């Protein structure tokens, strides 16, 4: 994809003619970018919830959401309005401060993860040089919020759910980080944009998926465990813990947990696209050369906008294809026991991730 003209500069030239200073424009641009990102992410989550309900209904030979809008497309929005209008109940004997701060501490780190996700070359809120490790760092705060929510509820089921969430996150955060480190070694960068650009030469043939198949499998399993999806939803197992750390929550606080889980799932799928599936680049080898030639025949402004739109669409299509696999996994596999979950993380995934990192390091040293 090409970007001959920066859209931010074009907007600044327009605002400059109206008498706005550079500093004021930068402030407005940051606020505008954050609002657009939050709106887009919220719409993406609503679509994800609708897709999961429809796919699960098809698997179980049901109809699923049908009456709230065409094909039930606004069912998730209706559920959000319902939760907003519900009463907010606080346990009488619980720790009010921990109970209230827990959902916020779970939701904010997930939103911060979207800062380093590039939907296209110029469509990224913060292009940090340590982008992928920034995501791992902020996501490691989430189990602390879950533990606070479980402890503050003064409920044995909630507390056990919080303990399980913390143990599960620690067990699978390390294999996940080692898989990301292997990708960073291949790309010689921790920046998400640089990692995508390193996969841009030969279409799908240059994807890290082919160079890191073991790391991809480890990343896929660990990301499902981090999102607490079946078969790894031990912290909220209904048959054992009622609803886990969410047992005592209602209203908007419960909605925060619900929203955070789907936001986290969408983040994981986007990072799979960025790390292993080439990001916003075309998957057909050498097809991007033809597209560049076609855009050069058009005006610079139009080609810039079209390139950005196509890049965003490609990123989202790849991400939702991975989400489809995650949804099918949830409604296909049974839940495992807590001892099996910990054994899988510490005795299986961690040694494999370490071995994969050792092989990647040896390969990179051999090429020097």
Curated annotation (Swiss-Prot):
GO terms for molecular function: oxidoreductase activity, acting on NAD(P)H, quinone or similar compound as acceptor; quinone binding. The chain crosses the membrane at residues 27-47, 97-117, 130-150, 166-186, 204-224, 249-269, 270-290, 305-325, 348-368. Keywords: Chloroplast, Membrane, NAD, NADP, Plastid, Plastoquinone, Quinone, Thylakoid, Translocase, Transmembrane, Transmembrane helix. GO terms for cellular component: chloroplast thylakoid membrane. InterPro entries: NADH_UbQ_OxRdtase_su1/FPO (IPR001694), NADH_UbQ_OxRdtase_su1_CS (IPR018086). It comes from the Eukaryota. It is an enzyme of class 7 (translocase). GO terms for biological process: photosynthesis, light reaction. It is found in: Plastid, Chloroplast thylakoid membrane. It catalyses: a plastoquinone + NADH + (n+1) H(+)(in) = a plastoquinol + NAD(+) + n H(+)(out); a plastoquinone + NADPH + (n+1) H(+)(in) = a plastoquinol + NADP(+) + n H(+)(out). Its EC number is 7.1.1.-. Belongs to the complex I subunit 1 family. NDH is composed of at least 16 different subunits, 5 of which are encoded in the nucleus. NDH shuttles electrons from NAD(P)H:plastoquinone, via FMN and iron-sulfur (Fe-S) centers, to quinones in the photosynthetic chain and possibly in a chloroplast respiratory chain. The immediate electron acceptor for the enzyme in this species is believed to be plastoquinone. Couples the redox reaction to proton translocation, and thus conserves the redox energy in a proton gradient. This is NAD(P)H-quinone oxidoreductase subunit 1, chloroplastic. It comes from Marchantia polymorpha (Common liverwort).
